Swiss-Prot record:
One of its GO terms (molecular function) is peptidase inhibitor activity. One of its GO terms (cellular component) is extracellular region. Belongs to the bradykinin-potentiating peptide family. The keyword Secreted applies. Keywords: Hypotensive agent, Metalloenzyme inhibitor, Metalloprotease inhibitor, Protease inhibitor, Pyrrolidone carboxylic acid, Secreted, Toxin. It is found in: Secreted. One of its GO terms (biological process) is regulation of blood pressure. This is Bradykinin-potentiating peptide 12a. Expressed by the venom gland. This peptide both inhibits the activity of the angiotensin-converting enzyme (ACE) and enhances the action of bradykinin by inhibiting the peptidases that inactivate it. It acts as an indirect hypotensive agent. Its main location: secreted. It comes from the Eukaryota. The modification Pyrrolidone carboxylic acid is found at Q1.
């Protein structure tokens, strides 16, 4: 299993 990647930054 691949390590969960960081969530994408939420635009303003």
């Amino acid at each position: 299993q691949q390590w969960p990647r960081d969530p994408a930054p939420i635009p303003p």
